[in-house]
From Swiss-Prot:
Organism expressing this protein natively: Heliobacterium modesticaldum (strain ATCC 51547 / Ice1)
Subcellular location: Cytoplasm
Protein name according to UniProt: Lon protease
Assembly behavior: Homohexamer. Organized in a ring with a central cavity.
UniProt domain Lon N-terminal: residue ranges: 14-207
Amino acid sequence: MAEEEKIRQTIQELPLLPLRGIIVFPYMVMHLDVGRERSVNAIEEAMAQDRIIFLATQKEAQTDQPGAEDIYQIGVIAEIKQLLKLPGGTIRVLVEGLARAEILEYIDMEPLIRVRVREHIEPDVKSNAVEALMRSLINQFEQYVKISKKIPPETFVSVVAVEDPGRLTDTISSHLTLKTQDKQRILEALDVTERLEILTEILAREMEILELERKINVRVRKQMEKTQKEYYLREQIKAIQKELGEKEDRQAEGEDLRNKIAKAKLPKEVEEKALREVERLEKMPPMVAEATVVRNYLDWLLALPWAKQTKDRLDIDKAEAILNEDHFGLDKVKERIIEYLAIRKLAQKMKGPIICFVGPPGVGKTSLARSIARALERKFVRLSLGGVRDEAEIRGHRRTYVGAMPGRLIQGLRTAGSKNPVFLLDEIDKMSMDFRGDPASALLEVLDPEQNSTFSDHFIEVPFDLSKVLFITTANGMHNIPRPLLDRMEVIYIPGYTEEEKTRIALDHLVPKQLKEHGLKKEQVQISENTVRRLIREYTREAGVRNLEREIASLCRKSARAIVKNPERRLSISAGNLPSYLGIPRFRYGLAEAESQVGVATGLAWTETGGDTLAIEVAHMPGKGNLALTGKLGDVMKESAQASLTYVRSRARELGIADNFHQNTDIHIHVPEGAIPKDGPSAGITIATALTSALSRRPVRREVAMTGEITLRGRVLPVGGIKEKMLAANRAGCTTVILPAENKKDLEEVPANVKKKLRFVLVEHMDQVIREALLEPVPVQAPEPPETIPAAIETSVPVYQGMLEETPPGLQT
């Protein structure tokens, strides 16, 4: 009864996976890719049960739908360890062989092959004969590993550790590269002793073949001399070329290249160079590495637009209409391009100008260059220089380097297919240098109209005329551009947009663009002018319109979501319901300060992103006359604060401040947003005003903003960035701006609609600033003064009032 139960346990019904050209042995782990329908079904059934499957090899690998007669009877019961579904319906499985088994009968053939198999249980065989066979097999396998050099030594170490004879044969067989029939023969040997003998015989035969191969290779290497070797290789190449249908005669390639050179209309110097390279190519053996380099070089020479150029659109009215269609405002830039067209119409051989657009991010520098190319009907090429450190990016690599290529200028011209494109060098101020060279120095030749007609790339090695190219560069600021490079360019500054300009840009360009990109129609979403104005005032604070466009895109996304839910819905986004779409406002529109305060003055600053307001805070307390400066200030700004304090000390009596205040008072000057570096002299009068306010208890008028450099004598010197600062003052809601009298000429650049909203106070001396900016003192109870302060000023209110009733001589008009 026990014997019958044992037999039943070894007989199983399992799904069958037919293998093509692969034999899996017990204890062997292997990846299999399964794609046939019946095979996939077999895998899925095995996974649904206990992951056990039967693996048997087909007699012919080409058979797609094998039957019972097409599959070997002996196979392996295996366990599926992992399963991964690949694109296309293919399944990749990781299987591990468990035991040999024999097919007793086929139960089903569709939708999968299901068989009844009998598992072969390995007997425990231990005898001297088996031990001798095992030792012989291990020695043979060791020699095989040494001769073949295809099996790592670690594998041999793991094989030696196997003590079971059956497992030893299966492990060695799985590592040998044998024919399918030989491996199947080993698999079908159920007797362990017989299996050892078969594998020993096969391994001995394989070693004999390997030894013969080694001897043949050694003998052939010794017999072949250099000339015979070259002849043999040449004959092989000829035979391969003949089989591939290639021409045996290399003169045909040379003739083809000469014809291309003749048609390319190359300059004389370039044509001579190209013909010399063709002659070199014809003399070279066909498969040497240098031949590939020469072919690549000739391909580049012939692909460049030596004589190809587009015809400029010289219709000034049409070009102006295109520029106005793409961009609102930017009159200076448009005027410069129209001037260029006018001169081109009069002087045909004019060299291309080299223009540098400098301005904050988001004002349209890059898109303007693309619009200029469209207006001129020229090709457009853009090269981003941000982060470029290698000179070879500009000049290319010499041909001696592996994988050498021309610089990105030459590559751009090849892409354009024209010798006179509009070539944009974007972010020219973001270049840097390292041990590979300085790309800015390489650009000196490119951006010099007197030199770029003979620009020489390291790879091309012949001059290329860049004088027809209209180079446009862009930068956020000029301080990072090397002075020699800046000297070669015509700088056109593009300032930030006013609120009116932003409104028009949004309504005429950004809103229609975003509606189209989000698949919305104008009738579905209405965005009013007041909505755009609130967007500008309370959700963005920038010189350009990049963030404004992002906010409009956010409105479109939320609108699209609502319309998808209800296609009949029509949305009207007004200034009132804007927070329901974008959340609470991010910025406070209005006065820079909510109320007039003591010791707080509003200055104006210039940054690469446009103008901005700058609050200066001053506090004083009993101490020893120390001055503290915080807010990440630069050296120039620190010196400006020292000069302001010196001015206030020298004018203390006239300003209503105790003469000896500095002896017993510590002063702290702070500029908020301490993580942002700040520098420059233009905050001088603002610091002096805040100091005077704090020490005299006179509040600074909240609607006043100011800019100007101060001297020790109180003179107010001119500063830069006036237009940007006025735009910032207008954005902040200030109504009065104090600025140096010498900056009056710069007000011409301020847009008219901004000038209408601001009152400008032109000053030459600090006394005028104090008179305009400060209010009457705030009557507060002063703290108990130190003993050294004179009794006449121990109480703050009466003393301040008394001192201010008499008009100081410095404040007289």
